[in-house]
Amino acid sequence: MNKKLFTNRFISFNMSLLLVLTAVFSSIPLHSVHAADNASVVANIVGEFQDQLGDSNWNIDSNITIMQYMGNGLYEFTTPTQLKAGSYQYKVALNHSWDGGGVPSQGNLTLNLANDSYVTFWFDYNTQSVTDSTKYTPIANDKLPRLVGTIQSAIGAGNDWKPETSTAIMTDDNFDNVYSYTAHVPKGDYQYKVTLGNTWDENYGANGVKDGSNIQINVTNDADITFYYDANTHNIWTNYSPILTGLDNNIYYDDLKHDTHDSFFRNPFGAVKVDQTVTLRIQAKNHDLESARISYWDDINKIRIELPMTRIGESPDGNFEYWEIKLSFDHPTRIWYYFILKDGTKTAYYGDNDDQLGGVGKATDTVNKDFELTVYDKNFDTPDWMKGAVMYQIFPDRFYNGDTSNDHAKTLSRGNDPIEFHNNWNDLPDNPNNAGTPGYTGDGIWSNDFFGDLKGIDDKLDYLKGLGVSVIYLNPIFESPSNHKYDTADYTKIDEMFGTTQDFEKLMSDAHAKGIKIILDGVFNHTSDDSIYFNRYGKYPGLGAYQAWKEGNQSLSPYGDWYTINSDGTYECWWGYDSLPVIKSLNGSEYNVTSWANFIINDENAISKYWLNPDGNLNDGADGWRLDVENEVAHDFWTHFRNAINTVKFEAPMIAENWGDASLDLLGDSFNSVMNYQFRNDIIDFLIGQSFDDGNGQHNPIDAAKLDQRLMSIYERYPLPAFYSTMNLLGSHDTMRILTVFGYNSADPNENSDAAKQLAEQKLKLATILQMGYPGMADIYYGDEAGVSGGKDPDDRRTFPWGNEDTTLQDFFKNISSIRNNNQVLKTGDLETLYAQNDVYAIGRRIINGKDAFGTSYPDSAAIVAINRSKSDKQIAIDTTKFLRDGVTFKDLINNNVSYSISNGQIVIDVPAMSGVMLISDDGQDLTAPQAPSNVVVTSGNGKVDLSWLQSDGATGYNIYRSSVEGGLYEKIASNVTETTFEDANVTNGLKYVYAISAIDELGNESGISNDAVAYPAYPIGWVGNLTQVSDNHIIGVDKPTEDIYAEVWADGLTNSTGQGPNMIAQLGYKYVSGTVYDSVYGSVYNSVYGVDDSGFTWVNAQYVGDIGNNDQYKASFTPDKIGQWEYLMRFSDNQGQDWITTSTLSFYVVPSDDLIKPTAPYLNQPGTESSRVSLTWNPSTDNVGIYDYEIYRSDGGTFNKIATVSNEVYNYIDTSVINGVTYNYKVVAVDLSFNRTESNVVTIKPDVVPIKVIFNVTVPDYTPDAVNLAGTFPNATWDPSAQQMTKIDNNTYSITLTLDEGTQIEYKYARGSWDKVEKDEYGNEFASNRKVTIVNQGNNEMTINDTVYRWRDIPIFIYSPSSNMTVDSNISTMEVKGNTYKGAKVTINGDSFVQDKNGVFTKDVSLNYGVNKIKIHVEPNDGSVYGNDQGRITELTKDIEIDVIRQENNSGSGTGNNNTSTSGSNSSSTGSGSTGSTSITSNISNTSNTSNTIGVITKNGNVITLTLDAGKAKDLIVNSKDKKVVFDITTIGEGQQKVVQISKDILDTSAANGKDIVIKSDNASIALTKDALNQNQIQNGVNVSIKDNGKPNVTNYVSLSNVVDITISGISGNVTLAKPVEVTLNISKANDPRKVAVYYYNPTTNQWEYVGGKVDASSGTITFNATHFSQYAAFEYDKTFNDIKDNWAKDVIEVLASRHIVEGMTDTQYEPNKTVTRAEFTAMILRLLNIKDETYSGEFSDVKSGDWYANAIEAAYKAGIIEGDGKNARPNDSITREEMTAIAMRAYEMLTQYKEENIGATTFSDDKSISDWARNVVANAAKLGIVNGEPNNVFAPKGNATRAEAAAIIYGLLEKSGNI
């Protein structure tokens, strides 16, 4: 656990723990404070360096490398001689044995020596940690840290505050420089510090400060506590966490766990059959959770269900608790589940990890990812010949030409396009993508043929048989105009180029004779447009659908209803290819097109059945189908397809082409296998070694652990028969050749070196070793085994190199497939991961107990398959204790039959570099264990548990296992017990123990474990009593609990020693006795709730008080909430509540207080229907004294039960403990301070699945030129990039709202109207997979999804500026080119190149000559290998841009100029009509004396008037002015659209030196230049300040109040930028509401006006704002309202803030003022208020991740000090409380004003004590300023959730109080 987090939690507990803790639910005690002495254990350092010490490597029997025992579990060994420089593997062996795998148990440690060196090794037995002196330097013994303080005497560690006496010396048991000491600390308050050594010379206190203050610790109950000291940071902390005994409104995320790969958490592993029970468990910190529920979505029934879980126990060490639920399902389906965990007001969700791979999940504040569970038909199976087969995929045209007579059977391909015939078999396939490039010789048409045919395949059957192939998969072979045949022209015919039906039948027969099965490729989503069915080109007799359409009646064609043809002749086609018209889906399914369904499925000779039995002889037919783009065909079509082919060949393969998770296809009603592209991608990612795009997606390197996680994800999702029959491919006709993926391409001179080939083949062999050793059908793509390489389609379809094969590679494939075929264990043996670390991955396969994974009988056998991607040999030690017994021997069948054996629970294997091993157990070994013991009986005793069981046949001994919870966490406590009885005397009374037993035979074969047996050893409780009497006439009241109630217990041996008897549970029970006189007189009137059964006892824990003789005394109290008689008693148990002993029952009476007035009734609003939740809201009650709380009651038809209580300031509650389809009744009861109760009305609601309003928000690049569309698996818009156009929200945000069913799994992408404009990743790559989301109800039947698009396919580079044909002034000699391109792009601008290191904006300065300048910009990938050297992909990312910029000729001079004339004189002016002219003018200088002086020269050029300031006069005026602002008024210098003031640098310097601002005042605007406004290093001679009037803006939805003012500042000798904002004032006309007026700037990139802000001065008719850049500005009045705020109290402020773009609606028309606002939403509002821009998120908080819509806002707010988080979490999705909102608001107020917080202390609110201590003074200040106000009755409600209306009100208050509105 994170040490900092530990500290934070410790602090938070001490702050919040106010109640005295009750009886301890303790667990197994910690080990003794001082570790048990283990000197008898012999520890050896063993490894690859022992031979240098006169020993043999890995010798566990060595006496040379025995480590010296140093005490307290520490061992040490120093080499007697120096070890040579190099790298070594090592580990620790115990007692000269590998039992348990050594230390560490998984893998070896590495020692790297740069020079010859002595090395010291350390091993800690207690923590099982190992290190060496190259990695670790310990603190010297005399300086070891130790505890000093008042705690010393309490723990028996010397005298208080005396370091020289302290025996609490800390040790570094984990060798991580964190030292620790564990002690049993009695209850009490203590102070302590840590000293280094036995003096005060170096000591550390609170916060790790040297000589710092004492550290406080309050121990509320006796506890074993570990103290920690970090030698690097000097931080000091403990693991102390008070025992959780009640609700603390907190859940410890780090302790939550559910692991789908661990049978303890999910049993059984993987997919389950219908009606099979699956047990799901989740772990939490002990006593942390109030409740746990599971929420799951049924993918078939489309329903979400929530069910409660049961707490089943705790871990053996007492740290964790476990919750469980058992589920079963009566139909095949896919289940998506997550856990809902509650503790008081805190709710957490635990779902799958971010990668959604299963295994260990992740806790979040909101619903995140679901775990997946597949439930399949119990009769689902696959043919045995599929399981473990070796498959071979053939692209017929490129395999072999066996019949030359059909070579030219056709001459035309599609339409009238010719077929390009290749007479040279070794030609490369024509790639029309390369047309126009040097060396291209093709015809540019996608049709070329190499004459391969069915006869050719038949001729090569012997070759395939010799290769080990048992299944052939053929790409399509039916009549088609193309070479790939995925555009079928006639399903009833074999393509003439491939042969005849007779050739087909002969191939089938011949293959079957050789034991080879054949799978056909079926394409039933689309046909060819050049087919007998569509007949677009009229080449076929008969009337095709298109021909009939052309003739005006599509129905005239027998195929007319197969297609959708639009009135303009366009038609639905596959992914936009008009050559592939799609079969119509009628009412959601192609099967509903009757003629199509009959033709393919239903008819006697339907295509699905015919080719499995074409002539009545099954031997002449194919054996199954691979089905193209199956996920683009309705599923019910495939279920009918399955039923049809089952009538011909039962369970014939249906292999789905599905590139992702195909679990929904494998439920048992259709497909029974899938093309396992996931397997391919995982293997490539493990072996690739670099990021690489293979044309189908991006590959990124992973290690062995991630590989295992991914493969396990597939294993757990697929039904076992399907998993063992998956088509595990490394390549196909749709992917780059595997050798080329690994870096070799024979046709590419950059990739065809011998070294590249050798490396690629090594990686291919590695992949094949794992493929051939893994469950499933190992698929070989034709030619891979012969060394064929090639890029993506069409290059991956090269011809087989007959006569030029790589025979060495072929021999490898033959050998490896032979090993697979000859060893059944590699086909159907079970699967277990044995090793997954770094570069090495190893799996185990077993047939044990004479059965394989399917229960089929085979001889016992085992295999270990391992691959090593490292360039160095690896020796791995595999723990086999749970895999196989000792003594089993193996031979490595691919490495010279090297022998291995299991010894001491371990096998040590040498795995060669860049290679692997295939270990097969030697024949004849007995791996069959006895049956597990039965009839296990346990008897609980005092300090012991007795066990007995029945003898198992063949057993020679038994192992005894023990846990604290059923179903797992077992620890072996006894081995090889020879009797059938056992006494466990090593138990602690009062704890739960779970036992299980296994049987072992004489060889060591161990059975599975028996059923669990549970025991509770305990002391017998002899007596309970002395219950004290509560005083009668107890006055009712929320602050009037009973006096303490005492009782005593005696249990001999437990209570008669000093202190609390361990594991004793004491509880006080109390109940209201109805029917009393008080009840009839008062109760029903004042205190009761109608329909509630309160007749039972309520139990609360009692607290240990002390010893009374031999008895232990306990106490508790309660607060009666009804008037009348109450009964109470105490009960005790010391065996976990299995048995209780109770005292006698006593009673007392409760009487009314003076307050007999009931609260007013709350009104409960009718909730809307939601799925799996009920959202309640009510109007608050009032009371003459005060409301205490609200109680929520629920009934499902019977009595009402109280389900929750909320505070008096909360008026809403969400009940998620409901089941869809069940009707519930609710009421809310208001409770006042005397427990007077008033009920609300009753509402009735039935939660049910409802459509969810799903809001997709996407942030796109700011250069996005056109509309954005959402494409994916959406109903009625499947993968249509031109449908579902999104609404533009702002410059780079688009949104669309859809209605989708909850639980729907959506895959999607963003595009801009076509697939040529689809989104890309930051490298410009295709995304490896589609975006995925499960639709859930996030509240109010809504869901919001926030995404980011990084790039667009068609825009590899975008140039913001300059624009082409742009003209610039003559004084501009350089220009900035600003653009945006992808990461890794090589950008060249006018010959200068650079590589873009990140996706996004770049800038580059270019020099300008006078006249026309051509700026040439080129972009291309810097490293083509990142894109697989795919020329098509590289071409997409390559672009040239040329921009013309005209720099004006310098012919008018500068300053006074030779063409200027000047005159001087007071108040003189001259105007002229020439193109140039000059006038000396008087400019009005505003200062205290209001003097006027002549200060410059005016020149006019067209509409541009320039004033050049006289430096001497201007400086004098600046120096002499008494005002801070010196105004140069240029309104009187003449009429012109543009006015320019030239200011020399010495004028600017004078202004800066005198602290004066220069103000340029023009006709419609003024600009103030402060001394540090401009970047001084960019100013050489001075600046030109230009103010240009562009007239009235053309806008809609806004009221224009000013002209457009274009402000620029340029340098006389270069560009000038702003160093800080400058103040600009615009003249405006009168506004209807000045509060809604703001300045906007025009963004030329987006052609949009964007909000800036500003402050209106209505009296002067101006608005002033701070400009951060030069642009065109204008002032608008914007009046924004929403439909749902018409009657809302905050209508005015919401409209004002919306008009100022500070708050936004949930939609364009809905604000939702009463909806609670989240912390992230309020933070975003504050940022907009302060005009703080988002910043790129850098990962400060664990609950915020990059890509979240609020991530960059959180970053900006955090850096600005607006938010703080809680040290780890920002809690962005939590509803913000009123006190949290106030705190953030006041930080913003401080940034708006000069405000400093006063120390006021308490507020004047009536609920001041409810305000958190940290917030009270902040709230007091805010109230004093009038920024916040209380609610009615002077209540602030600090913990109440703030609404969106309240958020708007407080922000408006900030604006108003800071004078900004």
Swiss-Prot record:
Keywords: Calcium, Carbohydrate metabolism, Cell wall, Glycoprotein, Glycosidase, Hydrolase, Metal-binding, Repeat, Secreted, Signal. Residues 1-35 form the signal peptide. Substrate binds at H526, R626, H733, D734, D793, R797. One of its GO terms (biological process) is carbohydrate metabolic process. Residues 1448-1486 are annotated as: Disordered. Gene3D superfamilies: Glycosidases, Golgi alpha-mannosidase II, Immunoglobulins. GO terms for molecular function: alpha-amylase activity; metal ion binding; pullulanase activity; starch binding. It is an enzyme of class 3 (hydrolase). Residues 1246-1354 form the CBM20 domain. Pfam families: Alpha-amylase (PF00128), Alpha-amylase_N (PF02903), SLH (PF00395), X25_BaPul_like (PF22058). Residues 1450-1486 have a biased composition (Low complexity). The keyword Membrane does not apply. Its EC number is 3.2.1.1, 3.2.1.41. Residues 1677-1740, 1741-1799, 1802-1861 form the SLH domain. It catalyses: Endohydrolysis of (1->4)-alpha-D-glucosidic linkages in polysaccharides containing three or more (1->4)-alpha-linked D-glucose units; Hydrolysis of (1->6)-alpha-D-glucosidic linkages in pullulan, amylopectin and glycogen, and in the alpha- and beta-limit dextrins of amylopectin and glycogen. The record marks D734 as: Transition state stabilizer. The active site is at D628 (nucleophile), E657 (proton donor). Belongs to the glycosyl hydrolase 13 family. This is Amylopullulanase. It comes from Thermoanaerobacterium thermosulfurigenes (Clostridium thermosulfurogenes). The gene is amyB.
